[in-house]
Amino acid sequence: MTQETRKNEIINTAAKLFKEKGYSAVTMRDLATAMGIKAASLYNHITSKQDILKAIIITIAEEFTAGMHAIMNSDASNIEKLKKIVALHINITSNNTNGMASLNNDWMHLEDQLDYYLQLRNEYETNFLSIIQRGISSLEIKANNPEIIMFSMLTTLRSLYLWIPKKEDLSANDLAHSLSEVLIEGINI
């Protein structure tokens, strides 16, 4: 097994343990046991539990940021951009439900990357809010409080990591379509 593959295996196993127990409760010994190796062997591939958490959270946050940039730069209507945001959340969450649990529940444990993470999150939310505000201005979206619209949508989208693993019979495309209908129909004019 290559160094990078083993590192990814460690990160994925840690994400699963963090989801099950929470970041603070997981030890390097727990991680080693889950992988069937000695704790000292982990340090051949990673430097600390904190580095694992950073790898999980920052990778996902950067993926969301890149997705949002693509959405912002598209020529789609504001309603279509909101649908693309729903699809972005579903695709990222479907591909990494364990990592999404860390993003939602353990971000505050980031140490030297906390400010960077918060910058990414704030930029994402600012862009999301901007789409909603432009949709209200262009009469695509009902004139409600844009922050309430955004946080209502984000609350649903951020909790998908809990629900998606239970619905293996539902494709990401079907879920994106259905969830867009539910979340956006109420604000669409």
Task: Give residue spans per PLM region.
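N-terminal intrinsically disordered/low-complexity leader segments
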Residues: 1-5
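Helix-turn-helix
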Residues: 6-9, 17-51, 55
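Amphipathic, non-transmembrane alpha-helical scaffold segments
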Residues: 11, 57, 61, 82, ...
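Short amphipathic alpha-helical elements of helix-turn-helix/winged-helix folds
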Residues: 13-17, 92, 156
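Short helix-capping/turn signature of helix-turn-helix
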Residues: 46, 104-110
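Hydrophobic alpha-helical connector segments
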Residues: 55, 59, 69-95, 149-153
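Amphipathic alpha-helical packing segments from all-alpha helical-bundle domains
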Residues: 62-65, 69, 95, 113-138, ...
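Hydrophobic/aromatic-rich alpha-helical bundle segments in the mid-to-C-terminal region
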Residues: 100-105, 114, 118, 136-182
